[in-house]
Regions:
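Active-site loop/helix belt of alpha/beta enzymes
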Residues: 1-75, 79-83, 149, 205, ...
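C-terminal accessory subdomain/extension
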Residues: 81-232
């Protein structure tokens, strides 16, 4: 294969360096796909990126048991009832066909959520897939929660991840965004709060702008999900 050809050329370079008395202290060449599929490319180190997130570099390599470690979550900030024939979001790109309950999610392209998901993506609310209504705006996205029982302001929203046994993979979000999962993971905005977990215990809460002073809300949310999963 082309990858093995490149490894052979790299080996030849290392041999030429060694012949001149030059030996790099560490040698590395393999990304996630190379680590999984090209044993000769492992050397001293490997540079796994996507695999470190528990994701596969391609569908053909799904034989390694990996579990996604990252999710993107928010909460409904508004729930409104609209009649049939009402327009939702900018430019009247969505019109309700029935009496519809709309959930407003405080995430938009300003947070790194792709505008291309307008009228085509989904989010999880109440363990159900809810379609995006109209355009994704800079700070808000609307979803159809008509069929979600007892939906209310404050309910959790999953933009990618798992909720109530239902999965919304980041790969699906990437496909709807006409890009790769790599880019989705890398383009989540700086102001989005990150909750870091080690061995089922929250260890840090921050944004990429700085440390977050108030840990309580994201930590409480995580502990609630962890305990519910353990009870199930």
């Amino acid at each position: 294969t082309y990858a093995r050809e490149q490894v052979s050329r790299f080996d030849a370079l290392l041999a030429r360096l060694a012949a001149r008395g030059l030996k790099p202290p560490r040698v590395h060449a393999a990304n996630s796909a190379g680590t999984m599929n090209v044993p000769g490319a492992l050397y001293d180190w490997v540079r796994v990126g996507l695999v470190a997130y528990g994701l596969h570099p391609s569908r053909d390599e799904a034989r390694l048991p990996l579990e996604p470690v990252m999710s993107f979550r928010s909460r409904l900030v508004q729930v409104r009832d609209l009649p049939a024939g009402a327009h939702v979001s900018y430019a009247r790109q969505f019109t309700t066909k029935r009496p519809t309950r709309v959930g407003v999610v405080p995430v938009g392209y300003g947070h790194g959520y792709s505008w291309l998901l307008s009228n085509r993506g989904h989010m999880l609310v109440g363990g159900q897939r809810t379609p995006i209504m109209g355009r994704v705006t800079m700070d808000l996205t609307m979803v159809d929660v008509t069929d979600v029982p007892d939906v209310a302001v404050g309910d959790e929203v999953v933009l990618f991840g798992e909720q109530g046994g239902v999965s919304l993979p980041v790969e699906e979000v990437a496909q709807g965004s006409e890009t790769l999962a790599y880019e989705i993971l890398c383009t989540i905005g700086k102001r989005v709060t990150r909750l870091y977990v080690r061995q089922d215990h929250p260890v840090r809460v921050s944004t990429l702008i700085g440390e977050r002073a108030d840990w309580s809300a994201p930590v409480t949310d995580y502990l609630r999900r962890r305990d519910a999963k353990a009870e199930a």
